């Protein structure tokens, strides 16, 4: 079973690399499902994060400074995020994307369960994970994957490594 695990410090280009890998998979005719959690900025200042279903584009706020849910750092989790994420990761696809496995996503029990089901399963996936991930279940599941550590200085090398990993992929 093929999987790619991408990690590195914030702002290194992990999500960009994952997006490029997904584009290559789609060009090969594969159906990719899963989640992406981009940040949202207003006036140059980050105000929160969305959770987006990468297959159909549906979205909800994952966390904002003004939501009502549990706090993670300076943000609070928002209602509706879990539903979008679980639905996206429950679809029947050729390859799954999880961007990212981080503190906010892991704080939502049903989303955590859906992400763990994907990374522990038998379907191919691409996962971006927080560099300080300490969750043993996820670390164990990701240990079977080809890992790429991205930094601002190694983005080009990381892309070459991802292309090499893609060359060994067969659906």
UniProtKB/Swiss-Prot annotation:
Binding site for ATP: 8-15, 95-102
Broadest EC class assigned to this enzyme: hydrolase
InterPro entries associated with the record: AAA+_ATPase, Nuc-triphosphatase_THEP1, P-loop_NTPase
UniProt keyword annotations, A-Z: ATP-binding, Hydrolase, Nucleotide-binding
GO MF annotation list: ATP binding; ATP hydrolysis activity
Listed EC numbers: 3.6.1.15
Catalytic activity: a ribonucleoside 5'-triphosphate + H2O = a ribonucleoside 5'-diphosphate + phosphate + H(+)
HAMAP family to which the protein is assigned, alphabetical: NTPase_1
Protein role: Has nucleotide phosphatase activity towards ATP, GTP, CTP, TTP and UTP. May hydrolyze nucleoside diphosphates with lower efficiency.
Family the UniProt entry places it in: Belongs to the THEP1 NTPase family.
Name listed for the protein in its UniProt record: Nucleoside-triphosphatase THEP1
